[in-house]
Amino acid sequence: MYRPGPLNLITDVPGLVVGHATDERVMTGVTTVLCQGDWTGAVDVRGGGPGSRETEVLAPENFVDVIHAVVLTGGSVFGLAAADGVTTALSHQNVGLRLSPASLAIPIVPAAVLHDLTNGGDKAWGLNPPYQALGRASVATASTTFALGAVGAGRGAKAGLIKGGIGSTSLDLGDGLMVGALVATNPVGSVLMPDGQTYWAWPFEIDKEFGGHRPGASDPVTDPLPELGRLRAAGRLTPGANTTLGVVAVSARLTKAEAKRLAMMAQDGLARAIRPVHAPFDGDTVFALTGGTADIGEGTERLMQLSRIGSAAADCLARAIARSVYCANSPST
């Protein structure tokens, strides 16, 4: 039986650290994944209202095949400035590409945003949004251990009509292959079945990581868009006002095309955990990070291993989504 890594976090994948920065007054924040060493990245965007930066550089046809960090942030378009802060902090640490010996270090730092501008926090920042400073602060706090729930990019998030947040999980596939996921959960859809207690992702749960609740004997009522009236009243039915932002990682070096396939397969984790998902109101975006020394072979063997990794990444992402909401709504948060 496959088990999570020691931390049950994306940082069980060697070479990754995660940092949060949270502004309680504004009810927003930034979560950054730092890639230490040699990493390749890709991204897959499925939602109808995404907000992002530097995602095109990750496309398989483009020449840059390294990545230094991924930024998940609140703040909608204002939040994209968080990547400026992360980029500046990393360049100051001499992390990044150099196009000439005299060049500044140029970090490759893609970012994606979620909308939390109507969550009740103080957004009267005038000409000084907090996100660049939050980005720098997230680099300073990066570690292999980090908080889950209403923190960082998940501080002001909503999952349907309840609190969303940050979640993370991992899965050890053996033979040196570790898969992990990180998510900021802010969808228009629901992560809970109609009983209001059981997560749609329950079949994938390990060790009661999101409460261990199981559905009753009766079949669930499968409303295509649960709580439609309340979502409309809460202003959630606006394109771009919701999203789920994910990062999956594996301890094997893949090509950019293979990393893209990994990101695409991992999107299935959203469909396993949220109903509905990939809606016009969402900006669902999943990044894939690949780096490490695990050998996945060549030819048909490599394709089989990539399929296995992609399936595990989807499961990890589904678990992370449920865990994010569970932690955000626990009595201690």
Residue map of PLM features:
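A structural signal for small-residue-enriched, beta-sheet-centric alpha/beta enzyme cores
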Residues: 1-77, 81-84, 92-333
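Active-site catalytic microenvironments for nucleophilic, acid-base chemistry
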Residues: 89
